[in-house]
Amino acid sequence: MLLQGTHRIGRMAMLLALADENESPVLSIPKDWKYCTGKVGSMNSQKVVAAMETAAKSNQVIETDVYRETHALYHAIMEALYGVTRGQIQLADVLRTVGLRFAIVRGTPYDGKKEGEWVAVALYGTIGAPVKGSEHEAIGLGINHI
């Protein structure tokens, strides 16, 4: 049940989220793994979750008709959002907005096949009052088994 050193799913997700558009992180993502990246900005946390879920489904990272996959992704997204928002998922209610890059990675980080597939969600960007220049950097990571 050892975590494979070359299969650190959270690290891969973080590197993808941290990479600028013109950067290509040097990653050797296993061929049978799936991933997607994107951007989302909103004062509404529901829109942030929906954008990431839509990206994962449209890029075939998760299957649209399998509830447990959507459920696992949801929990990984929420865990990553907790990191970005310091445990307070509220955005608009407390006059906060986010501008985030995200990466979603699905794969098998453990040696044993019985450990199954996992999903990692990494978020990187800014959070702050909806006034330009009043935001600061934030980062979050969520990992969940499928």
From Swiss-Prot:
GO biological process: L-histidine metabolic process; positive regulation of gene expression
Pfam family, one: HutP
Name of the featured protein: Hut operon positive regulatory protein
Keyword annotations: Activator, Histidine metabolism, RNA-binding, Transcription, Transcription regulation
Role: Antiterminator that binds to cis-acting regulatory sequences on the mRNA in the presence of histidine, thereby suppressing transcription termination and activating the hut operon for histidine utilization.
Family the entry assigns: Belongs to the HutP family.
The keyword RNA-binding appears for this protein: yes
InterPro entries, alphabetized: Regulatory_HutP (IPR015111), Regulatory_HutP_bacillales (IPR023552), Regulatory_HutP_sf (IPR036482)
Top-level taxon: Bacteria
Coiled-coil region: none
Subunit-structure text: Homohexamer.
Transcription listed as a keyword: yes
A molecular-function term among this protein's GO annotations: mRNA binding
SUPFAM superfamilies: Hut operon positive regulatory protein HutP
